[in-house]
Amino acid sequence: MTTTDTQQRRKLIPLLGPAFVAAVAYVDPGNVAANITAGARYGYLLVWVLVASNIFAMVIQYLSAKLGLVTGQSLPALLGARMRKPGRIAFWLQAEIVAAATDLAEVIGGALALHLLFGVPLLWGGVIVGIVSMALLLVQGGGRQRQFETIIVGLLIIITLGFLAGLFVAPPSPSGMLGGLVPRFQGTDSVLVAASMLGATVMPHAVYLHSSLVNDHEANELGPSTGDARHSSGHLSRLLRATRIDIYWALSIAGLVNIGLLLLAAAALAGQSGTDTIEGAHAAISSTLGPIVGTVFAVGLLASGLASTSVGAYAGSEIMNGLLHIRVPIMARRLFSLIPALIILGAGAEPTWALVVSQVALSFGIPFAIIPLMRLTANRDVMGDYTNNRPLRVTGFLIAAVIVALNLFLVYLTLTGQG
């Protein structure tokens, strides 16, 4: 390696980090339950779905980050500047519902982990998750963006180790893994499961947030950029290159976790009943692979809940600021968004039911995040010389069409009682 290469790498390192925060959305408790269920029911059959999902996610998150870097604004802010007040309020309401639904699933997941590990009642588990997430948000809100990112990366490492540890006890079949890369189905139920996995690929709040994260990160690392500096060819090209590297590694790790969960279930839980809930999956892992592996899995689930709910609250703050031009203290937002989850936990609602309801709300929000992203990044008036080229435009719109169609399909199945 030459001295020049080393210097270039050192310059890129400070620019890495935002994608690892966004990647937490791809390993939240809802994803855990979906991938465990897929592996337990169908073995290695649907590995290819997760591989395709990860590729889709990389493209979507890159476009969000690119939009933020080129314009210096977040996706919500750009949309807010182009809408009349009634439109902005309506768009904010749907985005806020999506953010609340996301937070609901993540708080419940963290509370379940505390219940599995320590027997903590679900309501008090939700309170603890909320308090810890507020502590994490205090770090981010105190102008310590790099420290916040470091904590989230640390939690992502715990998630990875917690969810993949079981593979050392029950290694997957190499031939099964290779066979799972061939796109195919096994009956109509497997099509539904695949649609669930692929349809949940892109979380709306991660799309909104990534366009803001890159600018918060740059301001923290390098200081606020002037318009001329931001749009200088060398500076922006370096940022975009770092962003591609950041997204590749962050989402590769998230994809590895998701695929690993499916492989673990395929190797150790195939054919077992009751694995369609997080509690059932934990019980099956503990009984099949031993209590130590079950405990490590629950620790990974706890890290997943803590990290994802902190990131979700961060996203909600950016959505409100961009669309309504109101900067509510993030602690106040955290307390407000925590209330629905605590009410559901306190009422004794079945956690799996709550997760299903939250996923339906997320499905409604997907088109409102992805379609504007595609339109803006294809608009030369917005992106200038960094407008998506034709292959990227076609790829992006095809991915968006597939994801939106699958989410609408899942909403239909859920509302008609077929999902």
Regions found by a protein language model. Give the residues of each.
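Juxtamembrane transmembrane-helix boundary signature
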Residues: 22, 49-82, 91-97
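Extracellular/periplasmic helix-exit of transmembrane alpha-helices
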Residues: 57-70, 214-218, 222-229, 252-280
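Helix-loop-helix module between adjacent transmembrane segments
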Residues: 56-61, 86-106, 114-140, 199-200, ...
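Loop-to-transmembrane helix boundary motifs in multi-pass membrane proteins
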Residues: 86-88, 123-126, 292-294, 298, ...
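Flexible loop linkers connecting adjacent transmembrane helices
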Residues: 2, 34-39, 62-87, 139-146, ...
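Membrane-interface "cap" regions at the ends of multi-pass membrane proteins
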Residues: 1-30, 86, 157, 193, ...
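Hydrophobic alpha-helical segments and their helix-loop junctions in multi-pass secondary transporters
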Residues: 156-182, 191-212, 373-381, 406-418
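Transmembrane alpha-helical segments of multi-pass small-molecule transport proteins
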Residues: 92-96, 117-139, 157-162, 327-343, ...
